[in-house]
């Protein structure tokens, strides 16, 4: 004989949490807006304005993720209740187990939707840029920056995000001096915003003939792609624009023309670079877009006294502003803010970051 009361209580609990989320996420308004967006996208002339059409498509995906999930939860709970009644009437343990398994699946789906409440910031739903910068440690730090880039690219791929390498400056011997990656996908900035900070690597260096233990640092800085309509005042006199030959991977045209662009905002010291297009003009436009996004992020951080301003985050790539320690010869990676750690170092370096990211978001970092 199987015990049905715990399952009934779980159904009630999941139903109650679903209703709370329904209200919190404003399901009715989102369903109405989804119908409006679908109607707009069905108009034959919608692609006359490609940017608007793309924005509508992105909005539809975001709305569907909420509306359809809540619909599935509510219908699923009805189905599970029906299965449970059948199992009791027929005294059928197989049907009972099926109901329990379906309920567990619904609970996981609900937990994923509940997690979206962590993404309440104005730009959490936006695409984002990730700047990586090698710090203390010479070639070892430059190799570490390259390892971090691979880690984040793997993580993005595992979540179904698209990535573009905007800028990549090779190290003197190996690895990278710096790189900028654009990460494209729903809530990309929300997921990655707590990764800003210094990452410390401790290992026996493959670049040391004596095999000694080395400590090196590289920094990550995450900022959202801001809407072109956001009014960010940039005085042209505050900008220094340099052109140069691209030094990283980029196809046959790299190093043949000075198409890469570096923009420095002199008052703040902020720098953006782009080299991923043959056209200097397009690279300049992209670098300006990144500069606008960085200045916006700086302004937002200045307004929020609970966050470190960007100058602090970028100033000292060393001991002072670490967020995570990767001690490879002890097989231990630990987040210094949340205390979360793992001994499966290779999995993390292969992009398994969710445990660290989720803990930092839940901690309100």
Swiss-Prot record:
Please give the start and end residues of each transmembrane region: none
Organism of provenance: Proteus mirabilis (strain HI4320)
Q: Which GO terms describe its cellular component?
A: cytoplasm
Task: List, alphabetically, the SMART domains matched.
Answer: PCRF (SM00937)
Hey, which family's this protein in?
Belongs to the prokaryotic/mitochondrial release factor family.
**Protein name per Swiss-Prot or TrEMBL:** Peptide chain release factor 2
Is Protein biosynthesis given among the entry's keywords?
yes
What PANTHER family would the database entry show?
CLASS I PEPTIDE CHAIN RELEASE FACTOR (PTHR43116:SF3), PEPTIDE CHAIN RELEASE FACTOR 2 (PTHR43116)
Post-translationally, this protein is described as follows, namely: Methylated by PrmC. Methylation increases the termination efficiency of RF2.
**InterPro entries, alphabetically?**
PCRF, Pep_chain_release_fac_I, Pep_chain_release_fac_I_sf, PrfB
Protein function: Peptide chain release factor 2 directs the termination of translation in response to the peptide chain termination codons UGA and UAA.
> Which key words tag this protein in UniProt?
Cytoplasm, Methylation, Protein biosynthesis
Residues carrying N5-methylglutamine:
252
Q: Name one GO molecular function term.
A: translation release factor activity, codon specific
């Amino acid at each position: 004989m199987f015990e049905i009361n715990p399952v009934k209580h779980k159904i009630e609990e999941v139903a109650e949490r679903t209703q709370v989320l329904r209200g919190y996420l404003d399901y009715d308004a989102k369903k109405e807006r989804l119908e409006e967006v679908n109607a707009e996208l069905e108009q034959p002339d919608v692609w006359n304005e490609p940017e608007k059409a793309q924005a509508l498509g992105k909005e539809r995906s975001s709305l569907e993720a909420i509306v359809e999930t809540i619909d599935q939860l509510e219908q699923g709970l009805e189905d599970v209740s029906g299965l449970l009644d059948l199992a009791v009437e027929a005294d059928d343990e197989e049907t009972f187990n099926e109901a329990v398994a379906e309920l567990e699946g619904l609970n996981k789906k609900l937990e994923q939707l509940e997690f979206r409440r962590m993404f309440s910031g104005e730009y959490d739903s936006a695409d984002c840029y990730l700047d990586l910068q090698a710090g203390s440690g010479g070639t070892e730090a430059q190799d570490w920056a390259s390892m971090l880039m691979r880690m984040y690219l793997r993580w993005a791929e595992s979540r179904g995000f698209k990535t573009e390498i905007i800028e990549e400056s090779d190290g003197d011997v190996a690895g990278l001096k710096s790189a900028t990656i654009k990460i494209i996908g729903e809530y990309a900035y929300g997921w990655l915003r707590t990764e800003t900070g210094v990452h410390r690597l401790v290992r026996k260096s493959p670049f040391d003939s004596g095999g000694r233990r080395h400590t090196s640092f590289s920094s990550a800085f995450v900022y959202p792609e801001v809407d072109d309509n956001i009014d960010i005042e940039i005085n042209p006199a505050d900008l220094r624009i340099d052109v140069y030959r691209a030094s990283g991977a980029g196809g046959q045209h790299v190093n043949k023309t000075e198409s890469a662009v570096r923009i420095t905002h002199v008052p703040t010291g902020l720098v953006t670079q782009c080299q991923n297009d043959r056209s200097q003009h397009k690279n300049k436009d992209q670098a300006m877009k990144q500069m606008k996004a960085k200045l916006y992020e700086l302004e937002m951080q200045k307004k929020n006294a609970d966050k470190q301003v960007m100058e602090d985050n970028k100033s000292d790539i060393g001991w002072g502003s670490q967020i995570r320690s990767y001690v490879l010869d002890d097989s231990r990676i630990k987040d210094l803010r949340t205390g979360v750690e793992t001994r499966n170092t290779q999995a993390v370096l292969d992009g398994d970051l969710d445990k660290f990211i989720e803990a930092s978001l839940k901690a309100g970092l």
